[in-house]
Amino acid sequence: MQLLTIGINHHTAPVALRERVAFPLEQIKPALETFKSIWLGPSARTAPEAAILSTCNRTELYCATDDQAAREAAIQWLSRYHNLPIDELAPHVYALPQSEAVRHAFRVASGLDSMVLGETQIVGQMKDAVRTASEAGALGTYLNQLFQRTFAVAKEVRSTTEIGAQSVSMAAAAVRLAQRIFDKVSNQRVLFIGAGEMIELCATHFAAQQPRELVVANRTAERGTRLAERFNGRAIPLSELPSRMHEFDIIVSCTASTLPIIGLGAVERAVKARRHRPIFMVDLAVPRDIEPEVGQLEDVFLYTVDDLGAIVREGNASRQAAVAQAEAIIETRVQNFMQWLDARSIVPVIRHMHTQADVLRRAEVERAQKMLARGDDPAAVLEALSQSLTNKLIHGPTHALNRASSENRDKLIELMSGFYKHSGSTER
């Protein structure tokens, strides 16, 4: 089996492309079924394994398959599934085989590949991806072991290095941007759209600035109200958004919608009603919640996850020593995993050898039983059994030696000498 990771992320693709290859949570299980099917056929020796990780910053397919054309097949499947021309997608895709796939998984879970260096949210997202793949019956020995090791490495990196210390989160970066536009956030009205983990983090950071008003708009009223009350704010129905948008100076949105929920026309009306007082908008969703054309309006300052990434990276340089330490840990663990993987590769060979030897053994035992049944001398039967079994067991190695070239024969002799050194002693 070969490990392979196919994907795009914030390093290789802009948000405009990432949002087009994102997988909503409810689509992942059926997507895994169709994805695995590309490798299910008469030539497949082992059932393929797969998991899909889809976040704001990355969409990745983790695979274990014996298909030699897995890379091309996976990229073509991703292109077809999202109705994207292959020539538009392929330049942004990375394909990482074997040790590169292992190293990548370890780095992602450890926060080394994140926009926010050392952030911990990705671990929970990876665990969700693994849980979903397991529920879909898409995991097996190889990916199960990969992800178990991945989470162990992530824990080791975070507990033995300072990789997460003093990190600038996306939420903190949003506040910093707001402070560049408004003298005081405390004078502004802030609207949060959504009630998930990212909005909760943003609300925590903005609430610390004591804004004039804090409001939450969410599709589920109860959840929106619960979040708003935590910060002494209030909640409004999402349906009121178009008519109430002009009331807010700062709007932060992060929902799971597959289509924009804030269009150009609605923002144009809000700007007009505000008499061109500026609106600061942060769109943390992928796919995006706010139509990108909104950013072209005067008096509107629209930022996406990629824009916030530039601010986040300003704080990453100071932690390069921790990065080097984390990379060293990861490299050691990659080598350990590859040793396990190499050992797994010979399991089918060993199993086949045992099966073949057992077939020979059964045939000889059956032959000996027939000889005993007709009254042959037991000692002679045992001698015949041992001689015949010995001849058949060494027939394969002997045949290989006789047919090998002189160069290969020397290697075989050396290997077989080692085999028989470990075959056991006749002493009791």
From Swiss-Prot:
Which keywords, in A-to-Z order, does the entry hold?
A: NADP, Oxidoreductase, Porphyrin biosynthesis
Residues annotated as the enzyme's active site: 56 (nucleophile)
One GO BP on record is: protoporphyrinogen IX biosynthetic process from glutamate
- The feature of type site (Important for activity) is located at 104
Pfam assignment, any one: GlutR_dimer
The main enzyme category here is: oxidoreductase
Binding of NADP(+) occurs at 194-199
Q: Answer yes or no on keyword Oxidoreductase.
A: yes
Which residue ranges traverse the bilayer? none
Q: Which Gene3D superfamilies match?
A: Glutamyl-tRNA reductase, N-terminal domain, NAD(P)-binding Rossmann-like Domain
- Going by the entry's taxonomy, the superkingdom of the source organism is recorded as Bacteria
Q: In which pathway does it act?
A: Porphyrin-containing compound metabolism; protoporphyrin-IX biosynthesis; 5-aminolevulinate from L-glutamyl-tRNA(Glu): step 1/2
Reactions catalysed, as given in the entry: (S)-4-amino-5-oxopentanoate + tRNA(Glu) + NADP(+) = L-glutamyl-tRNA(Glu) + NADPH + H(+)
E.C. no: 1.2.1.70
Record-annotated residues binding substrate? Answer: 55-58, 114, 119-121, 125
Example GO molecular function term? NADP binding
Query: What is the additional note?
Result: During catalysis, the active site Cys acts as a nucleophile attacking the alpha-carbonyl group of tRNA-bound glutamate with the formation of a thioester intermediate between enzyme and glutamate, and the concomitant release of tRNA(Glu). The thioester intermediate is finally reduced by direct hydride transfer from NADPH, to form the product GSA.
> In UniProt terms, what function does this protein have?
Catalyzes the NADPH-dependent reduction of glutamyl-tRNA(Glu) to glutamate 1-semialdehyde (GSA).
Domain description from the entry?
A: Possesses an unusual extended V-shaped dimeric structure with each monomer consisting of three distinct domains arranged along a curved 'spinal' alpha-helix. The N-terminal catalytic domain specifically recognizes the glutamate moiety of the substrate. The second domain is the NADPH-binding domain, and the third C-terminal domain is responsible for dimerization.
- State the oligomer form and interacting partners: Homodimer.
Give the record's family classification. Answer: Belongs to the glutamyl-tRNA reductase family.
Q: Which HAMAP family match?
A: Glu_tRNA_reductase (MF_00087)
What is the official name of this protein in its record?
Glutamyl-tRNA reductase
Q: What is the lineage of its organism?
A: Bacteria, Pseudomonadati, Pseudomonadota, Betaproteobacteria, Burkholderiales
Q: Which gene encodes it?
A: hemA
